[in-house]
């Protein structure tokens, strides 16, 4: 079976973490069975040396591509940018901190193939024994409350929409992401909602996960995110996902 893969890494001020992340991902890809693979780093207007270290790594790893946003647009914008440029038949987006180890991709791939799903996404909620390092209690509790809002406003049954480890059939991803409206925290909810609306099959998969220091989600943006499930519902009512 042909296995063609793109990996999108949204990056904002990831100068310190990015080299190790790229080393681990490219090493994994070289040892795997992918007939074609590429890694797309999407810089979101970083103020540090993110682009420089990505370019330095690319000098010895031509499979790495670098895209740059017009300023700081948000994680959702970055992921969409990468998804629309992906060349593989399947595209994974992964957080730059590899809070879900890249090796967990095999679980998503297997689940997608067995269920014939176009979307397979990592979940911390289906098997919490797979969480090595938990978030602080307040953040973890807020995440559970956020999921309640997601289920109430969108009607989706998923227990964790926010894990930054999602695999898409690229053909489906282009249809999903071109309809995306949210550019920051809540985009995960939105793209899963759009996928269901368009009739694509999505499967939630338990994956290993560790909380990593240096989160880019601040208190204000985190509170604002609680409105995103409502925004998704409003966009749906206005016909923006047609």
What are these regions, as identified by a protein language model?
Residues 37-40, 51-85:
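Conserved donor nucleotide-binding strand/loop of the catalytic core
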